[in-house]
Amino acid sequence: MESGSGAGRAIYWALKNVLLGPVITRVFRPIQEGTENVPDKGPAIIASNHLSFADWLFMPVALDRRITFVAKSDYFTRAGIKGWAQKRFFAGTGQVPIDRTGGRASEGALRAGLKVLQRGELFGIYPEGTRSHDGRLYKGRTGVARLALLSGAPVIPSAIIGTDIIAPPGKILTKIVSPTVKFGRPLDFSRYEGMSEDRFILRSITDEIMYAIMELSGQEYVDMYAPAAKEAAAREAKAHEVDEVSPQA
């Protein structure tokens, strides 16, 4: 079931306005800033930092308009009643499936994003490509720039603050705090129209978007891709463990 279908929209509305949204609002009392920067109609790309799996719960609550994200196709293809319910839940919360294996991941997200934007809707994307493992902001993938140039849609930089306290990496829920969702002024890249294959332009646009996100979030920026940084941290931690158990000379 595509998120753009009538059934998907109905589930999205019910989850946001009746079942899940009111609970999130009452329990966590999220704070929204800059929502006036998100257009009332027409396509736009919401580019955000990514601290926790809980991010996708608070972003839709912050906006009156429906917002669509991409999710692993595994969530939509599992068998049985549980798989059926999971598929309906993820589709109903405004997510569309993509195959994230190999080199097809970025193209799948790009195609999904273009379809959403062509319908005149909001498409959410995390340029870092994965959650930050340490709360810092990492180098953005250039897919967000390609999407902006191919669609002609404005990019709304966004920052989510506090969700890593609510649900740190590897944990579901540890603490109830009020997260903040911020939206910055729209970024227009129409001056680069027709240059979606120029890697230098794509890098420049992506860096501009990441700088805007950093300004909103107040995070420390690291000029390294998040997966590489996470792997480096894991290697360092493992080396430290070995040093601790090694016999002293």
Regions found by a protein language model. Give the residues of each.
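Non-catalytic C-terminal accessory region of glycerolipid acyltransferases
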Residues: 2-7, 11, 107-249
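Short secondary-structure junction/hinge motifs that connect adjacent elements
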Residues: 33-41, 227-229
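Alpha-helical membrane-targeting segments
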Residues: 3-27, 78-94, 172-178
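Catalytic core of membrane glycerolipid acyltransferases/transacylases, capturing the structured
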Residues: 25, 38-103
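A generic local structural motif
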Residues: 18, 30-35, 54-56, 83, ...
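Short gly/ser/thr-rich secondary-structure transition/capping motifs
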Residues: 25-32, 105-107, 163-165
